[in-house]
Amino acid sequence: MNSVGDLLFIMLYGGATMASLIACLYLLLRKGNAFAPDVTPPLTLRRWAAAFFAVSCLGHFWWLLLYFYSRHLNMIGVMVASVLDTRHLNMIGLMVASVLDCVGMLTTITGTLLAMLQDRKRPLWPVVIATMPYAVLWALHLAYPDGLFLDLAIAYMVLSCVLLTVYLVFAAWRYRHWLCDNYADLEHKEIRSSYIMIFITALLLILFFGFEGRYKVISFIVQFLSIPFFGLMLWRVETLQQLDGMTGVDTEDPLPAEPEETAPLATLSGIGALLKRHCEDAQLYLKQDLSLSQLSQTIGTNHYYLSQYFTQQGLTYNAYINGLRINHFINLYHEAVATQRSFTAQQLASESGFRSYSTFSAAFKQRIGQTVTAWMRDTTGVE
């Protein structure tokens, strides 16, 4: 090593390599969930994440081999160098490694992030096609090594990463609305963590493709951030609940099958009475993990018609069910106060159908405009 800085970089580089290798082997070999035993993550997501970690690990290996080859030509390198210019040979190695990184990293990281959105399958071929100009610009750089085409290749990759980020954020935003339209309980289904993953991924990709080879400090930053990023990615994969057996999972259609025509007004007007009888009066809303599809089957209507009804009412399915649950909580609270029964807000929230108190607290504040504690104090003076 030439300096302490080189030693530190090799340590970070080796740490990132081992972190990606361990994460890959964990996802491939361990069937259980070590992070959240009660959560079953999507198998497709685990496979995409394992592929991403494998590509990251292999990428670290081939860049390391290229580094040592450029520093110390082995016997094969010497023989080849007798025919070709050594500098040109190194540029070929850089091109191959860069293009492999581009195709492998962008494809697998995009596949992983899209697999977190379980409303439908999204094609990856546009991402693969988008990497082709990068390879072409690198080939032109080999033919005309004046730096122009290399700068264009870098600028193209940075722009591609920005556009990919915009697309992923839009897809996540649509998925968030789809969840609210189809599920009452969003615990282990929420996508706030996915937004964080998208932006961190964008930052690392832009730093990696745009600046790492030009500034040594950027190389340190990328390797330093890669280790916690791999851990965060693995945690996100293992804490995302699979939606199998529910509406819209693993289908090629962007949304659940829809009738060619909208529901007749008479049908929509009758849905209100069906909901009153089968959901509100029967207190079906107390059932945890009640989905739009399950509710539509119970009341005997098409789930698309039911979705249309909620849209007509200016509601989402999530808001409708949680509204009923909050009203149930309020009734339980007043009964408990009137009978002087001991209780906790957490207990009443659970009896009202909420799986977690944090979900209840957020829904309550959004609907009532106050925190649970403040509302109880203002209502009866009891906290």
Per-segment meaning from a language model:
Residues R47, L114-L140, Y144, I154-M157, ...:
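The cytoplasmic-loop to transmembrane-helix boundary for the fourth helix
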Residues G32-T40, L179-A184, A338-Q340:
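Short helix-coil transition/hinge motifs at the ends and kinks of transmembrane helices
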Residues T110, P145-A273, H303, F343-G353, ...:
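Alpha-helical bundle regulatory/interaction domains
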Residues W235-S352, S358, A363-Q366, T373-E383:
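Membrane-proximal linker segments that couple transmembrane helices to downstream signaling/catalytic modules
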Residues G32-F35, F68-H72, L117-R120, L142-D146, ...:
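Transmembrane helix-loop junctions in multipass membrane proteins, especially transporters and channels
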Residues C24-L27, W63, L137-H141, F208-F209, ...:
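Structural signal for membrane-spanning alpha-helices in multi-pass inner-membrane proteins
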Residues M1-A135, D151-L152:
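N-terminal low-complexity or simple alpha-helical regulatory segments
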